[in-house]
Amino acid sequence: MIIVILPLLFLTHPIFAEQFNFTLQSFEVALSMFLIVCSMILINMYIEYRTPLFLFLSTIFSSWSFLTYQSLIMFYISLSIAIVILLLNFNKNLKLLDYLKVISLFLLVFICSMIITQSLIFIGHQMFSIKSTNYLNSKITWGKLPFFEILSILKSHFKNILLAKVIFYNLGFVISTLSCFLIFIKKIILKSRFISFEILCMLLLNLSPFMLTIFMGNVEPIRSQMPSMQFVIAFNFLYVAINLTTKSFLAICISLALVISFRQGVTTANLFYSERAKYEEDVVFANRINIQLDSLNVSDRKDYSLVLIGEKKVNSNLVIQGETLGRSFFAWDLGSPYGTSSRAVGFMRTLGYDFKHPSKEEYKKGLLLKENMSAFPKKNSIIIDNNTIFIKLSD
């Protein structure tokens, strides 16, 4: 029954909903997560059988995963630390040097994988003239903002996590870490072997989901904490459960894990429902726009650029919003060079309304015209100027 805690808390976490909303990443990221787990298994097989092939395959699997999604680097670190902690609890006759040898293997595979990853990226840039984006570097605030301002940003973020102020977080992290602290007190009293080392490992494990946040000095998208965040919560509960000897306390621990899993599952289901409801509302709104355009004798959409000014948010009270889930295509990128037009036009095209994307000049012209326009669907909310359609969505 204890082992059920891990998959239940791990698989039901709402961060997965946010991540797998990116359909084009779904298979690749899921496969890479599986390969990281396989890499861990292969390292342990090497420890037992001393077959170099296992270490080689482990490095290949890790390299593949690191290339696929950067947050899986943190997942590798989390799993490595968790395995060391399990060894400390189940292989208590080992010497400290034995544990350090295991850690050295994890480090060896990690370093080799990072070297392979960076080498392949460099070769790809040179051979195919692929330009690297500035996406990650642009979010790093160290050296760009005052030190204490960065600390304030991080403090606010960690406070939101600990107090579960964001829909993706719950009290599972706080409850599990406090429970681990109580286990540490018990082990210190009983003078357990290598307790200082074990506490250090647990501290690093619980910091691992936030390594990217600390590295950037900024709040990254929630999906970048996937899957380390949910793994750490699940492992904390598992760690507490395997160290409880009283059946009543064990029952309480398992019950708490089940309750948190259920609440996570409900939140995840609500997020997926919200995304579906948002999509259907966007379809209805897109059709309303095109029905009105039909009445204005706009025939072949391919001849027209579509400029949308303002935004249209989801109206349903049943929709809850994540970072991307539940957010209308007609409410994205407000303030960007193309406003909401870019994603909204792309969405329209998936429905068969094959508008052209507007130019920056056309969007700037729309910003000038909006002062004399009403918000859709009122009269004068649509202006057709040559082959450009201007629609004001909001004031």
Regions found by a protein language model. Name each.
Residues 173-178, 242-267:
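Signature aromatic-anchored transmembrane alpha helix within multi-pass, membrane-resident enzymes
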Residues 42-63, 92-101, 249-252:
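Short hydrophobic alpha-helices at membrane interfaces in multi-pass membrane enzymes
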Residues 13-17, 69-73, 80-82, 233, ...:
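Short, solvent-exposed loop/turn segments at secondary-structure junctions
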Residues 1-15, 34, 49-53:
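Transmembrane-helix signature of polytopic, membrane-embedded enzymes
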